[in-house]
């Protein structure tokens, strides 16, 4: 049975509602809602910030207040790896996509000696996320010389930055924090059991009209 490589976003989507995950990502028999104007604007902002950092393009005038941060990021010494893909097998060894057990793409990785910085630009509502913890574990697996990873979520709309630092000895705990959800997802693929998980999102934010909780 083919089970696609999991990512932080797929685990989050599955945990929110396995049934919705199934219809949108496995069976693909339900179309998600088209992106709202806010989502489209967020994607454009994300791209503009990426281009400002990676390609030295000017920011839109409405986002000029971020120019100071863009300049600081560009001035950080080290090897810059924009849009860096991570793919690991079940033994946490780097691999190609055919053997990938887990995967992710970091907006920006900066390597400098025994340390790395991983940055992710966010345009949605500020909320807790373990995505960059997972990316730190990826970095420890990819580069044995890395002993410390500094992460930063940059919340572009809310003008906030959430920073956290991980040491190499944190890697095992990071993996353990994801494994229960990954195991549940794998079991759903194997058994075909994708239970609905009703929540407030069912009222307006679920396209699965065939679900008894949709719209309630």
Residue ranges and their predicted role:
Residues 1-216:
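RecB-family 4Fe-4S metal-dependent nuclease core
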């Amino acid at each position: 049975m083919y089970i696609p490589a999991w990512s932080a976003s797929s685990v989050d989507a599955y945990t929110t509602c396995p049934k919705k995950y199934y219809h949108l990502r496995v069976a693909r028999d339900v179309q998600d809602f088209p992106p709202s104007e806010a989502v489209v604007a967020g994607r454009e902002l994300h791209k503009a910030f990426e281009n400002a950092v990676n390609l030295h393009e000017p920011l839109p005038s409405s986002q000029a207040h971020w120019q100071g941060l863009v300049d600081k990021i560009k001035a950080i010494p080290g090897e810059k790896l924009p849009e860096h893909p991570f793919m690991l097998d079940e033994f946490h060894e780097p691999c190609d996509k055919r053997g990938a057990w887990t995967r992710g793409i970091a907006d920006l990785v900066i390597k400098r000696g025994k340390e790395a910085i991983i940055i992710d630009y966010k345009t949605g509502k500020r909320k807790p996320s373990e995505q960059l913890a997972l990316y730190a574990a990826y970095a420890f697996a990819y580069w044995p010389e890395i002993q410390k990873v500094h992460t930063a979520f940059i919340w572009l709309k809310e003008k906030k930055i959430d920073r956290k630092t991980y040491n190499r000895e944190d890697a095992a705990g990071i993996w353990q924090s994801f494994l229960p959800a990954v195991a549940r997802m794998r079991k759903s693929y194997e058994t075909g059991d994708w239970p609905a998980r009703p929540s407030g999102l069912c009222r307006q934010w679920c396209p699965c009209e065939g679900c008894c909780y949709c719209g309630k």
